[in-house]
Amino acid sequence: MPFPLASQGSQQSQKTYGITSPISLATPKDTDCTLTQKLIETLKPYGVFEEEDELQHRILSLGKLNNLVKEWIREISELKNLPQSVIENVGGKIFTFGSYRLGVHTKGADIDALCVAPRHVDRSDLFSSFYEKLKQQEEVKDLRSVEEAFVPVIKLCFDGIEIDILFARLALQTIPEDLDLRDDSLLKNLDIRCIRSLNGCRVTDEILHLVPNIDSFRLTLRAIKLWAKRHNIYSNILGFLGGVSWAMLVARTCQLYPNAIASTLVHKFFLVFSKWEWPNPVLLKQPEECNLNLPVWDPRVNPSDRYHLMPIITPAYPQQNSTYNVSVSTRAVMVEEFKQGLAITDEILLLKAEWSKLFDAPNFFQKYKYVFYNLLAMFAWGEIINKNKKRCYTLKKKKK
């Protein structure tokens, strides 16, 4: 697996990425390359890099799934009596998004996938005939559908790989192989569930188009994701940041230091976001107007958007804040972690510490000793409430 140990050349400095000029156009020194190699060696034991044979297995499995989709769409087209000329070129395609599409998935990670179909294929077709087709495949295990979810999904294990499949029906007669989902015009005449399903691919692809050096971005993101997980701040549900938010912060760092490599970018990440003046938003590009009347993040128009504490705005239309769950307390925790990360990477760059120090897991009970007792109190109080509920219910039954 190739890793970036040097800049891509002076041409990178000719283009401005993001909404501001770069902070620095400095190119890597020998020490930066050495530190980047040490970073790679430090990351390896944590399983953040997949072996080549595992990667090829994923590619092969996705290819099989893609062929199944094409075959299924042809069958649906025949059942709906489309002309033979259309059936022969009807297409259909599986796109990936999330960590796999970004190129930062870890060993054994699942794959987020999107099934894109032409206009005559309904979502109900996916959850009926395609679901039945999947059932018949010997590679498919643990098949289940969640049709009524906020974003409807089919979950399965395909040849040992866990895959989540979303669905989007485009207003096109056929789906070409070279379809670019970043094209905003594809959103016209789509229902909201299709737009939500498309959003993951559109955001992921846009991020990759907005960084100056994809290899440096990927290695930096692997390091930051591992650091966030080790420090227990990788969770959108708990009010911290999820995968796409971390990716956008790393992408913004890459835009500000377009010629830097991973060892420098990890340090600059902590430098930038330990000093960021929240709630100023993090933007990878200026929001675009598409006149499709979809709700977008805009504090000038939407009063509720003004109360977001740590806005990180997705770069694809319709732009959304990916961190709406962040609270005052979780933001304070993250900012403190950024400051500690900066202090450690300062030491690493001065050759006074090793990369392993950055990924040392903090002692939870030393750091949050009072939270433990509060949780015990909450559990105890919950038991009292549950017992009282049962008692009240029993009394009501007796009275009857």
From Swiss-Prot:
Please provide the record's keywords in A-Z order.
ATP-binding, Magnesium, Manganese, Metal-binding, mRNA processing, Nucleotide-binding, Nucleus, RNA-binding, Transferase
The EC code for this enzyme is: 2.7.7.19
Q: What is its main location?
A: nucleus
Q: Name one GO cellular component term.
A: nucleus
The record's Gene Ontology biological-process terms are: mRNA processing
As its record notes, the protein acts as a catalyst of: RNA(n) + ATP = RNA(n)-3'-adenine ribonucleotide + diphosphate
Q: Where does Mg(2+) 1 bind?
A: D110, D112
Q: Where is this motif: Nuclear localization signal?
A: 382-390
Which residues are noted in the entry as ATP-binding?
F97, G98, S99, T106, D110, I111, D112, D164, K225, Y234, G243, V244
Cited InterPro entries? NT_sf, PolA_pol_cen_dom, PolA_pol_NTPase, PolyA_polymerase
Q: Which SUPFAM superfamilies match?
A: Nucleotidyltransferase (SSF81301), PAP/OAS1 substrate-binding domain (SSF81631)
Q: Name the cofactor(s).
A: Mg(2+); Mn(2+)
Report the protein's function: Polymerase that creates the 3'-poly(A) tail of mRNA's. May acquire specificity through interaction with a cleavage and polyadenylation factor (CPSF).
Q: Which family does it belong to?
A: Belongs to the poly(A) polymerase family.
Q: Please describe the quaternary structure of this protein.
A: Monomer.
Q: What is this protein called?
A: Poly(A) polymerase type 3
Which species does the entry assign this protein to?
Xenopus laevis (African clawed frog)
